[in-house]
Amino acid sequence: MKKFRTIALATLFAGNAMALDNVPESGFSWVGFAGMTVSNLKSAGLDPKMGVTFGAKVEYMLPSAYGTYLSAGIDWVHKGARDTYFNPTLNTDETFKVQAHYLEIPIHVGYRYNISDELGVYGEFGPYFAVGVTGKGKNKYEDLPDEHFMWFGKKYMWGNQKGIQRFDCGIGFRVGAEYKNMYSLTFGYDWGITDIYVDDYRTANPGLPKLKNRNMSLTFGYRF
């Protein structure tokens, strides 16, 4: 029995020592990334649209926190949506497309676990804050000239009334894996919680459902 206790204690201490060896080092680091997005507009009944994203973030691995870290970044995110349907008013098929480019600042808290000296996995979540930089849309008709419009600004698809605001915010998460503490592959998803219709437009059209951004991303990163 004494021999068994000795072996058990030795195994426990060895496991703890190995776990401590794999704890990430504390301090700051930078990560640059680029990849693809699949986005949509909730409650609009539209189809998702593919886009691109790129940016950089700074991470601070907290000391004596066993893998807990804070991160903040600045991302360029391409969002949008599309749909194809029959327009009974114009008696023709219509394809609606919108592209919106946002500058986003995600602020996350995360946890990283190093499986070995070369491979680590991580997950993080938190809010994001975004501003629409540019956006455009198009109504493409089968038998009529195409109609182009600005997504942000006074000229909107429903006349000259400003309909879409530039500000957006929401919450999101990221999960991924990193190789040799340099190369990473990350999957993310963001839920917009802001109704992006302008208040005046919402008041003038009370029957409209709330319009919110949804965005999924897959990115490759490099740690500096």
Annotate each predicted stretch with a short phrase.
Residues A34-M36, F54-Y60, I74-W76, I105-Y111, ...:
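Residues on the lipid-exposed face of transmembrane beta-strands in outer-membrane beta-barrel proteins
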Residues L20-E59, Y141-D143, G221-F224:
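Short glycine/proline- and aromatic-enriched beta-strand/turn motifs that initiate or cap beta-hairpins
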Residues D75-K79, N160-G163, D168-F224:
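Predominantly the C-terminal beta-signal and adjacent terminal strand-loop region
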Residues M1-G27:
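Cleavable N-terminal export/targeting peptides
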Residues S26-F28, P48-V52, Q99-I105, L119, ...:
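Residues that define the transmembrane beta-barrel architecture of outer-membrane proteins
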Residues K42-P48, R82-N91, G135-D146, Y197-A204:
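Outer-membrane beta-barrel translocator domains and adjoining extracellular loop/strand segments
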Residues T37-L41, V77-A81, Y128-T134, D190-I196:
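Structural signature of outer-membrane beta-barrel domains
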Residues A65-T68, L119, N181-F187:
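Repeated loop/turn-to-beta-strand initiation elements of outer-membrane beta-barrel proteins
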